[in-house]
């Protein structure tokens, strides 16, 4: 409709691309870089220097940080999500002064929570830290610490319960599958849920 809206959409797309390339360059180093849509078979990809990719991502994120709105529907990239990624890429390329400046701006808009704020505050043996790491905290609009969320609402329907998103699946490979990693005494070494013996029914809210 206008330049601001166009730039906001473009900035959000730049964020998504920069996020992927930030992870790719840190995991693999030099990788192929695509700056346009591929609409037909292509076999002649070649790698770009990781630092040139990160510098391009930094440029794109400066644009995104300027144009993407502060307030967005949950699950979408907002100004401060762009700012956090910009800060990380600035540190990756050695622009520490810019990283500090952006970091201060983001922190200034997201003060730490200092008081109880979810329905869990009535549970015994809980505190603010429990609130912050609860499911409820991630959908509570009064939570000033939240910057960008992965939206997934657990359901009570047995057939639908596995449609929710597990945070670990977004951050790491599925290393708990099938109990492949064992302890020296043969017990499961990694799991996505606590052992029944370790659960506290008074405070666990999964």
Regions flagged by a language model, labelled:
Residues 80, 86-206:
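An aromatic- and glycine-enriched ligand-binding surface/loop that stacks and positions planar moieties
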Residues 1-77, 93-98, 108:
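Aromatic-anchored glycine-rich loop motif in surface-exposed flexible loops
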């Amino acid at each position: 409709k206008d330049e601001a809206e166009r730039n906001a959409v473009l900035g959000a797309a730049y964020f998504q691309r920069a996020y992927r390339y930030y992870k790719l360059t840190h995991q693999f180093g030099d990788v192929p870089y695509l700056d346009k849509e591929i609409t037909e078979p292509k076999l002649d990809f070649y790698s770009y220097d990781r630092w040139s990719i990160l510098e391009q991502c930094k440029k794109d994120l400066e644009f995104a940080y300027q144009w993407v709105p502060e307030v967005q529907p949950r699950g979408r990239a907002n100004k401060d999500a762009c700012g956090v990624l910009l800060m990380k890429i600035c540190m990756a390329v050695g622009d520490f002064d810019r990283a500090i400046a952006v970091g201060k701006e983001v922190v200034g808009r997201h003060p730490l929570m200092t008081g109880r704020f979810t329905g869990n505050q009535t549970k015994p043996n809980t505190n603010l830290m429990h609130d912050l790491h609860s499911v409820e905290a991630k959908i509570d609009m009064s939570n000033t610490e939240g910057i960008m969320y992965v939206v997934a609402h657990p359901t009570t329907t047995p057939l639908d319960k596995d449609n929710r998103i597990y945070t670990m699946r977004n951050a790491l490979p599925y290393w708990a599958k099938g109990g492949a990693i064992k302890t020296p005494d043969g017990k499961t070494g990694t799991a996505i849920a606590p052992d029944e013996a370790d659960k506290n029914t008074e405070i666990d809210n999964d």
